[in-house]
């Protein structure tokens, strides 16, 4: 019986940035945030989990919709896991329970323009 050799291959993305489509959901309806408050919420989530080092990560809000509380974020690829984990563990804003939903993540901004799961074929 021949021995099987396995090789571990790790792919490191050459992209400098990753893009995230996220949505903030509150348990109560009627909570509104402007883009500055939303950005501060992101920085607070990073600070809560990773301290000042996390808060210093460069996160850009490329688009923001105040009605749906959804945004497209740009983060340096090295900070993607930190941002994602801090958003996952974030749970309250001004004593109101909330949760971030990560809808899509891609190293390509164009990939976030559509969702194949919602595509309607004729």
From Swiss-Prot:
SUPFAM superfamilies: Rnp2-like. It is found in: Nucleus, Nucleolus. This is Ribonuclease P protein subunit p14. One of its GO terms (biological process) is tRNA 5'-leader removal. InterPro entries: Pop5/Rpp14/Rnp2-like, Rnp2-like_sf. GO terms for molecular function: ribonuclease P activity; ribonuclease P RNA binding. The gene is Rpp14. Component of ribonuclease P, a ribonucleoprotein complex that generates mature tRNA molecules by cleaving their 5'-ends.
